[in-house]
UniProtKB/Swiss-Prot annotation:
Subcellular location: Cytoplasm
InterPro entries attached to this UniProt entry: RNaseH-like_sf, YqgF, YqgF/RNaseH-like_dom, YqgF/RNaseH-like_dom_sf
Classification via SMART domains: YqgFc
Function of the protein: Could be a nuclease involved in processing of the 5'-end of pre-16S rRNA.
Keyword presence, Cytoplasm: yes
PANTHER family according to UniProt: POLYNUCLEOTIDYL TRANSFERASE, RIBONUCLEASE H-LIKE SUPERFAMILY PROTEIN (PTHR33317:SF4)
CDD domains from the UniProt entry: YqgF
GO MF terms, alphabetically ordered: nuclease activity
Protein name: Putative pre-16S rRNA nuclease
EC number(s) reported in the record: 3.1.-.-
Source organism: Sinorhizobium medicae (strain WSM419)
The entry's keywords: Cytoplasm, Hydrolase, Nuclease, Ribosome biogenesis
Family: Belongs to the YqgF nuclease family.
Keyword Cytoplasm attributed: yes
Amino acid sequence: MAILTIEELAERLPPYQAVAGLDLGTKTIGLSVSDLGRRFATPRDVIRRVKFGIDAQALLFFAEKEKVAAFVIGLPVNMDGSEGPRCQATRAFVRTMGERTDIPSVLWDERLSTVAAERVLIEMDVSRKKRADRIDSAAASFILQGALDRLALLARGASGDRDAP
């Protein structure tokens, strides 16, 4: 799988295919998927992490089931913009996944995505236990929605129609 910038993905992405969002944690992988028009991100069940081979197989099954054309993977950049061990682990995961699939990936700054997701779940009056179960996929949705919004902006710029919704 190639690692692309969001601009490169916008040029290569075929129309009417879904994009998946991933929030890689140490215990789970939060998942979300776009609609075919790539306007909305919807959370999906998490993958409980076991070891890389099993995690990769589950992720590829998800991608096939959802007909995913690309992955947007949250990159856990520190608040000051520096990259720590979690960024290195995410990059290593993406590189290793690249040996197993041709589906391209974009690394997307995920700063505050989990905080935003938790606030939304609290506002929705989701219990603490259910929040713990849903937070990673909700964060994956925030990550993916940011990328979808950027893809839409790039598409409007490419078409010259800056006033389109």
